[in-house]
Structures are given as C-alpha cells and as structure tokens.
C-alpha cells in the first residue's frame, strides 16, 4: 500500500493542481486574445464572403426569431403580472408601462437575448466547427487555397455582431406587447396608450448604451463559439465539449460585459 500523505503534502498537491488550472486559464485567455486579433486583421481585408455572411445572418437572425419572440413575450407578461400588485398598492398602475420599458430595454432584454444566443448560436458554431476540425475539413480547405479562418470564423462572427442587436430590439418590442396583454387582464388600456406611456419614460441614456453593448454581446457569442470549435481536439467527444464550453464561456463573457457596461453608464450619467 502507498504511504499515507501528511497534511502538508496534501496541501502542496492541491496548490499544484490549482496552479496548473490557473495556468491553463491564462493560456486559454491569451490564446483567445490572439484569436480575436486574427479576426480583426482578417475582417479589415477585402474581399468578403458576402454570400456566406448573409447565410449566417439568416441562421442567426431569422432562425432565432420564434424562440427570441416567445421568450420576450413571456418575459414582458411575467414582469407585468409580478409587479402589478405592488404598484396597485401605491396607486401607480399608470407607471407600469414605463417601468417595463426601462427594465426591458436597459437590462433584461439585451441580457436574456444574448444568453439565448449563447445557448442556441454559440453551441451550434462550436459543434459545427468542432466537427469540421475533427473530420479534417478545415485542413482540406487550407489545401484547396481557401482561407478557412476568413470563410468560417469571420463570417459567423460578423453575422452575430449584426444580428444580436436586431434580435434584441425585436425581443424588446415583443416583451412590451406581452406586458400590454398581461396588463389588460385586470385593466383596460389601448395599445397606443400603452406604448406612448412606455416610450415616454425612455431616455437616450437608456437606449444608446443598451444597443451598443449588444454589439459586444454578439461579438463574444460568435468569437468564443468559433474559437472553441476551431481548437477542438481530435476525437468525436471533443465536439460536444466544444459546444458545451462555448455556451459556458460566452455566457460568462456576456455577464462580464454587462457589468462593465453598467459601470461605464453609471459614470457617464
């Protein structure tokens, strides 16, 4: 039987394991930064794969409208139903449209939309590129004089950068409509009156930062999804690992960007 380890030796092993994990984290972060640098280098060089960019926009945008719309509708309806009793106690029913619009536009809409894109789009890109890496299709593209990075990574990342803001606006509008229907369960309000009241509470400082950060959300969703798939190891199980890690890493990046955006907006106000 192997000799038992004393507490000092056990602690030393744990520290060594943690240090190894920390080194892997910083190595992956540096590799991701280099991957992003390669993206910015290639995205500024024409010609562009317009056909592939439009096709990826179709997959990212149009194919996600039902899920994004359904989520936005439920989000707006639940927010209205949950807050109405508290607002009614203070006689502030008329403030519900403004409260919903500010909450959805500033924070809930962009973040929820980005997280859905992480799960639906980021995982698809990670699995798709991971499968191509495992089956050596990327190597075949390099041999055939096609730039695989430009064709696979640049097009997909540009599509997410362009479509996530549009999906966010779409989700916000559907959420307001869901809030309107939920409000009419107990109260009577016209659609025009509800939207006028909702928009009257929105200011430039509410809308502009929310739209700007969605471009960054789209960037990290596309880039991290492609990065995980591009660096998948040989073997079929690595495809699933690439898809899973793409969702986790991009979701974490969304929360970090959202926190930084909130701090910057607070400093500018």
Where is each model-derived feature located?
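Hydrophobic alpha-helical transmembrane segments of multi-pass membrane transport proteins
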Residues: 96-139, 167, 224
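Membrane-helix cytosolic exit motif
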Residues: 229, 248, 252, 256-269
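Hydrophobic alpha-helical transmembrane segments that constitute the membrane-spanning cores
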Residues: 71-74, 114, 154-183, 216, ...
